[in-house]
Amino acid sequence: MGTALDIKIKRANKVYHAGEVLSGVVVISSKDSVQHQGVSLTMEGTVNLQLSAKSVGVFEAFYNSVKPIQIINSTIEMVKPGKFPSGKTEIPFEFPLHLKGNKVLYETYHGVFVNIQYTLRCDMKRSLLAKDLTKTCEFIVHSAPQKGKFTPSPVDFTITPETLQNVKERALLPKFLLRGHLNSTNCVITQPLTGELVVESSEAAIRSVELQLVRVETCGCAEGYARDATEIQNIQIADGDVCRGLSVPIYMVFPRLFTCPTLETTNFKVEFEVNIVVLLHPDHLITENFPLKLCRI
C-alpha cells in the first residue's frame, strides 16, 4: 500500500468560527518504516474571484488584477526530518483562528465567480528518490451571528400584465391575476424562505409555478466591476393548471455552502434573490423578482 497521509479534523461537521481553535490529527500509515525530510501543515483561507467570459473582453486590464485575496495563512512544522515506524502514527495539531489587524474571516461560500474556501494542507518531504506526499482537507467557517435584533420584513405582492417590467408585447399577454406574500425577505440562513401564492384568475392554462434562487456576484476593483446573476436552485411548487383561489405554499431551504450571509466588501459582493416563475400556455413566462438579505443569528 506504500505510505498514506491523512488529516482528521476533531469536529465531525468541520464547522468553526473566528476565535476558535481548529484541532485534529495528521495520520501517517505505512507497512514499513518511512524516512522523511520533515512534515509541515499549512492552514489557508482565500477568496478566489473569477470573471465571466462576457466580461473578459471588456476588462482585460481588470482581468489581470483579480488575484486571490488571502484571508488567513499559517504554517507549522509538525515533525523535523527523521523516520516514522511501521504502522500508524498520529500527530496532533492546533491552529487558532485569529486574524491580525482588521481582516475578517468570511463565511465559506462556493459560488460561480466568487469562491471563499478554507483548507488544511499537510506536506511530507522525502528524499529525491521518493515522491513527496501531500494531503488537502477543507474545513468550513461560519461567520459570527449578526449583532442587534433580527427584524422580519414581510412582502405582499400582486402580479398582473400591468405590473410586469421588460414586456415588449404587453397586449399579447393573456389576462391573469396572482396574489401572495413572502413572510420575510430578511432571511435567517438556517431557516426556510416561506410564504404563499394564490392564482386569483388566469385566461390561459398554467403549466407550472417555480421558485428560483439566484446568486448575484459582483467582482470589482479600480478599473471597473463585473456583476453576474446565476441560478443556485429551482423548485417547482405547482404543476399543471393550478386551481383558482387555492393557496400554494412557498417553502425553500437555503442550501449549505452555496449560500452565505449577504456579503459586501471593497473587492466583491455576494447577494441573493428569489424569482417566482409562472409558465402559461402556450409558452408565456412570467417572472417576479425579490431581493433577499441573508443573515446568521
UniProtKB/Swiss-Prot annotation:
This protein's GO CC annotations: endosome; nucleus
Subcellular locations according to the entry: Endosome
Keywords on record: Endosome
Gene3D superfamilies, per database record: 2.60.40.640
Coiled-coil residue windows: none
Keyword Methyltransferase applies: no
SUPFAM superfamilies: E set domains
GO BP annotations listed: endocytic recycling; intracellular protein transport
Tissue: Ubiquitously expressed.
Domain of life: Eukaryota
Functional summary from the UniProt entry: Component of the commander complex that is essential for endosomal recycling of transmembrane cargos; the commander complex is composed of the CCC subcomplex and the retriever subcomplex. Component of the retriever complex, which is a heterotrimeric complex related to retromer cargo-selective complex (CSC) and essential for retromer-independent retrieval and recycling of numerous cargos such as integrin alpha-5/beta-1 (ITGA5:ITGB1). The recruitment of the retriever complex to the endosomal membrane involves CCC and WASH complexes. (Microbial infection) The heterotrimeric retriever complex, in collaboration with the CCC complex, mediates the exit of human papillomavirus to the cell surface.
Subunit structure, interactors included: Component of the commander complex that is essential for endosomal recycling of transmembrane cargos; the commander complex is composed of the CCC subcomplex and the retriever subcomplex. Component of the heterotrimeric retriever complex consisting of VPS26C, VPS29 and VPS35L; within the complex interacts with VPS35L. Interacts with SNX17 (via C-terminus); the interaction is direct and associates SNX17 with the retriever complex. Interacts with SNX31; the interaction is direct.
Similarity comment text for this entry: Belongs to the VPS26 family.
Protein name in UniProt: Vacuolar protein sorting-associated protein 26C
Gene: VPS26C
